[in-house]
Regions:
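Alpha-helical packing segments of well-folded alpha/beta enzyme cores
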Residues: 40, 71, 157, 161-164
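Metal-dependent nuclease catalytic cores that hydrolyze phosphodiester bonds in DNA/RNA
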Residues: 1-84
Length: 177
């Protein structure tokens, strides 16, 4: 979805003519970001395992809708009323709102995909690093992570996101551009 927002034709080429799509080099920076994301997710697992409601959390939850939307949430929490909270894990020290790493837009897509797949989403959170945390010995997962509630921001973007998703699906259904 974010690829569509950055360059629609690039997404079309990737999905419709993948043999012509040039992935480009896999940079050291990209590898670093991916590795850090997995490390943060591991710290989140440690943190949640120490919580009384830790059993309510699942990792890598897949949302697949009948109209072709597909998303994987880093973490979800099942609430007592049957709804879920979506937690997106990021290696940043704050919520990123600008391009190209607009975490709110990414979370908005995840929420839309989850709801299209039949889930009721109650809350959306970006889990990021605490910029005030200073490591002293063993990493303290309780102090390392911040859960930023971005539900209201996602709610504000959901109509815009729905229109962008419709445009992306329309483009992907086009045989030639």
């Amino acid at each position: 979805f974010l690829q569509f927002l950055h360059c629609p034709k690039s997404l079309w080429l990737l999905k419709r003519k993948p043999t012509l799509y040039e992935h480009g080099p896999f940079s050291n920076y990209l590898q670093k970001i991916i590795t850090e994301g997995y490390e943060i997710e591991e710290h989140l697992k440690v943190f949640l395992s120490s919580q009384a409601d830790g059993h309510k959390y699942s990792f890598q939850t897949v949302f697949k809708s009948s109209n072709g939307l597909f998303a994987i949430a880093d973490c979800t929490r099942k609430n007592d009323d049957g709804s879920i909270d979506i937690c997106e894990v990021k290696s940043s020290t704050s919520v990123q709102r600008g391009s190209p790493q607009n975490q709110i837009k990414d979370a908005s897509f995840q929420r839309f995909a989850a709801e299209a797949a039949g889930f009721k989403v109650a809350g959306v959170f970006i889990v990021h690093l605490n910029s005030q945390y200073a490591r002293d010995g063993v990493i303290d997962s309780n102090e390392l992570l911040v859960f930023s509630d971005v539900t209201a921001e996602v709610d504000e973007l959901i109509d815009e996101t729905q229109q962008e998703i419709a445009a992306a699906l329309l483009l992907l259904g086009t045989l030639d551009i």
